[in-house]
UniProtKB/Swiss-Prot annotation:
Homology family: Belongs to the CodY family.
Chief location of this protein within or outside the cell: cytoplasm
Organism: Listeria innocua serovar 6a (strain ATCC BAA-680 / CLIP 11262)
One Gene Ontology molecular-function label: DNA-binding transcription factor activity
Keyword DNA-binding recorded: yes
Protein name: Global transcriptional regulator CodY
GO BP annotation list: negative regulation of DNA-templated transcription
DNA-binding interval(s): 203-222
InterPro entries assigned: CodY (IPR014154), GAF-like_dom_sf (IPR029016), GTP_trans_reg_CodY_C (IPR013198), Transc_reg_CodY_N (IPR010312), WH-like_DNA-bd_sf (IPR036388), WH_DNA-bd_sf (IPR036390)
Location of region: GAF domain: 1-155
Key words of the record: Cytoplasm, DNA-binding, Repressor, Transcription, Transcription regulation
Domain of life of the organism encoding this protein: Bacteria
Subcellular location: Cytoplasm
GO cellular component, as recorded: cytoplasm
Amino acid sequence: MTLLEKTRKINAMLQNAAGKTVNFKEMADTLTDVIEANTYIVSRKGKLLGYSEALPIENDRMKQMLTERQFPEEYTQSLFNVGETSSNLEVSSQYTAFPIENSDLFTKGLTTIVPIVGGGERLGTLILSRLESNFTDDDLLLAEYGGTVVGMEILHEKAEEIEEEARSRAVVQMAISSLSYSELEAIEHIFDELNGKEGLLVASKIADRVGITRSVIVNALRKLESAGVIDSRSLGMKGTFIRVLNDKFLVELEKLKNN
């Protein structure tokens, strides 16, 4: 492939990702294909978002890292010291992508570190490694362009997460605001009783202890269930099984209690 063809292939990653869930594995595959190197996309916290290996590394520790999809904290933190692309780092470098315990097997191994930056912040790191042949200027151009594309997708994913979180919080707030004072009081007692995200509730016992009618509890649960905040299932004489579906519910409920 020519440099132009390789650039177009990376550009296609961005076009194909539009409106879809980000697939960092496919991105890593593309970068491995055009740069001809092992590719690891690592988040700022060391999570392995995606990887592709042109030459699999036969090392138990490396295999475990790939299986667990997590890079060591010390190594991840050290990557923040790399503020710009660092190319052709030898096995003796602290940033090498090759296992140091087997350095004698990879004496000619080379690593390139590309910081992934977006929105003025460090989002992660693109790590490339290969045996013997140096990373050329063309390789580095492709790597930095690839890092930019990956950064844009990380930002897009973060924006979607923030949007989803805001939507979940809004649903919870609307559901809680629909409750009457007595229904809200009932809900607070119910989840004090459950002491978690799910559990068995006997409405009559809570009604008697708190001094409210059973119908208040039933109405409160129905409102939350219709809003998609909880799921409830009657178990007959045993009571009602309740499970929280929206993670923001307990947080907002705790805020209300503290206020």
